[in-house]
From Swiss-Prot:
The keyword Protein biosynthesis applies. This is Elongation factor P. The gene is efp. Pathway: Protein biosynthesis; polypeptide chain elongation. Keywords: Cytoplasm, Elongation factor, Hydroxylation, Protein biosynthesis. It comes from the Bacteria. PROSITE patterns: EFP. Belongs to the elongation factor P family. Involved in peptide bond synthesis. Alleviates ribosome stalling that occurs when 3 or more consecutive Pro residues or the sequence PPG is present in a protein, possibly by augmenting the peptidyl transferase activity of the ribosome. Modification of Lys-34 is required for alleviation. GO terms for molecular function: translation elongation factor activity. Its main location: cytoplasm. Pfam families: EFP, EFP_N, Elong-fact-P_C.
Amino acid sequence: MATYTTSDFKPGLKFMQDGEPCVIVENEFVKPGKGQAFTRTRIRKLISGKVLDVNFKSGTSVEAADVMDLNLTYSYKDDAFWYFMHPETFEQYSADAKAVGDAEKWLLDQADCIVTLWNGAPITVTPPNFVELEIVDTDPGLKGDTAGTGGKPATLSTGAVVKVPLFVQIGEVIRVDTRSGEYVSRVK
């Protein structure tokens, strides 16, 4: 099995920790004035979703995680599962609610997603970075009503709620950044 040392660490690197695949969210090399150098990392366990801060002594080796990231197309959802299809082989994968997580509110039919597989089963679903959704409910923006933070909540066609500028109305299509859940722009 492949291994990584602390010099290989970078955000996005996947490795095994306590028998569970993890991904490095952020890392920092620390060389104190006295003592051994170490790498301070923030990792997210891919199955449980827990975020941990872990320090590794310089030169420590970790086992590479045997995970695959596949570009799949979201097909449909039934009572308990979301179904994704490989665009070339037409192979179907089913992901449960735990694997889909917060990505559910950004999934549109035929959207290209990155699905992470471990032992052949989906463990995480990453939606596209930007999605275009229609606003189905929001307060009307009154002219001259700029005394607040300059935003209002809007419910989108998938059920997600995002903060939008006052000029955006019901029925308009907006672009949303799925990583932060923030409004980006109106779609012409």
